Amino acid sequence: MKPDIASTLASLKDFQRATVDYVFERLWLAEDQVKRFLVADEVGLGKTMVAKGVIARTVEHLWDTDKRIDIVYICSNSQIARQNLGRLNVVKGFEVRHADRLTLLPKVTQSLRDQRVNFVSFTPGTSFQVGSSGGAYAERVLLYWMLAACWGAAVTGAAY
């Protein structure tokens, strides 16, 4: 079901609505469009609400032309991401997916094909830090099966 943009936008304060309109204009309508936009403000001034408004306007804008709309949410930590994803979901009835680690996204991508609107989140602390760790167990299992599928045989771990 198409999101109720009017109720989403009506819940915003005037300065939040002005920000939503400006961001949407720059992302989708301006002659000199941008591909990304950072909204930075003091704690408690409604950045999440602004994001919800931008998402609502974007989903409405793409609804008639795109078969699938993917919303990717990058947040400072996993707990906040899980909390905010429910708030950002402007299309009720669509499941929110959270991939704790970027490398685990393939575990949820198959189900993304079945939905019109998808919400996926990542957290930099788990997705984007590179170190000497072997990664999470689930990552190693996923990589094993991906390599096995590519090579058409069981991966033994033996040196080649």
List the predicted regions and their residue ranges:
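Extended charged low-complexity segments that act as oligomerization/scaffolding linkers
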Residues: 1-160
